[in-house]
Regions:
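A membrane-topology feature that recognizes alpha-helical transmembrane segments
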Residues: 1-352
């Protein structure tokens, strides 16, 4: 059966993506007062954050190596469930901690942490028992993780370091899909197990009745549902309409938008980051529909965020021409790499 990305799936996934970005930004506005500027926070100001950043990078490298080994040699289910449990507890803890602090700003840290942990564990227990609400849980954990990383790296190191980190993730995503080739199998395993690592939408689309595309008799006989078979006989060829978006694809734009606001207090810059991310997601979907292969989402998102940042730094006050030029160059280089790679893939598929 043919697979494609339908209009309803595009609207659904784009809506969830943008809702997550705006919720993440709205949650930090009451809780954090910006205390740094782009200029005075270009280098680390807090010694504790240096240790956090170092171990954060080490953790990422270890996770990548473990994932590669697991996908190659491990055929069980326990590892994926443990990884899901860790992500749910980690992300949802900071989500509920920020949310409760917004509602009850006078609450002490101990009851705040205890309540947040209890809700996180309850959410995990629900997911384990019923294995439902994947999209909602993924959004909650992505928002929480985005706020946590944006706060620690953004405030501790400044905008340029945070921007560089997102760029490194874009490079990693590119390598994981096109070079190391373990990200697509990992996404497939996560989808098959319904793990809270991604949001997605899947539906059955049918061609219009005037379509010339018709299913063969032997294919029609394979459809066990009599109602669906009746519709397929009169409406043309059914196709699976599906799209998936990983939690990292949701978290990283939010990390940059949230961190940028917490550093400078410039809401316009954060809004431009989110707008660029939305445009990047639409561009990614366009590429998916055109090339019909699994693609990394973070590189296009990063390219369009950089392009919109370049414009933002030119028109915002105070203006920053140097950052505008830097992000503009990064956007052009990123898009060039994407187009060259896809052109090679398209040429290879044509030759085959």
């Amino acid at each position: 059966m043919e697979r494609k990305i339908g209009t309803r799936q595009i609207i659904f996934i784009l809506s969830l993506f943008l809702i997550a970005q705006f919720i993440g930004l709205l949650l930090v506005i009451p809780s954090y007062s910006p205390s740094y500027s782009y200029a005075n926070n270009a280098v680390p100001q807090q010694g504790g954050s240096v240790s956090f950043f170092f171990w954060f990078i080490i953790d990422i490298i270890i996770i990548i190596l473990v994932l590669m080994l697991v996908l190659r040699y491990y055929k069980g289910n326990m590892f994926f469930r443990l990884l899901e449990a860790y992500i749910i507890i980690f992300g949802s803890f900071f989500f509920f901690m920020t949310l409760i602090n917004d509602i009850l700003p006078a609450i002490a840290i101990f009851p705040l942490s205890a309540i947040s942990l209890f809700i996180s564990l309850a959410l995990l227990a629900y997911k384990i028992k019923f294995n439902k609400m994947r999209n909602l849980i993924t959004l909650i954990t992505s928002i929480g993780a985005g706020i946590f990383i944006g706060a620690n790296i953004g405030i501790g190191f400044g905008f340029l370091t945070l921007y560089l980190l997102i760029g490194l993730f874009a490079v990693y995503d590119y390598l994981a899909v096109f070079v190391l080739k373990f990200m697509i199998p990992f996404a497939q395993e996560a989808s098959k197990r319904n793990l809270a690592f991604m949001i997605g939408s899947t539906d059955l689309e049918l061609s219009p009745s005037k379509s010339k595309k018709r299913m063969k008799k032997e294919d029609l006989e394979k459809i066990q549902n009599p109602e669906m078979r009746y519709i397929a006989e009169r409406s043309g060829t059914p196709s699976i309409s599906a799209i998936m978006l990983g939690n990292g694809d949701i978290m990283l734009p939010m990390t940059l938008a949230v961190g940028s606001y917490m550093i400078s207090g410039n809401l316009f810059i954060s809004m431009m980051i989110i707008t660029g991310a939305g445009a990047g997601l639409l561009f990614t979907i366009f590429l998916l529909r055109k090339y019909k292969i699994g693609l990394p989402a973070i590189p296009p998102l990063f390219a369009f965020m950089s392009a919109f940042l370049s414009l933002a730094f030119l028109i915002s006050k105070p203006r920053d021409p140097s950052l505008s030029i830097l992000t503009g160059i990064v956007a052009l280089v990123s898009l060039l790499v994407i187009f060259v790679t896809l052109r090679k893939i398209g040429k290879k598929k044509f030759e085959e």
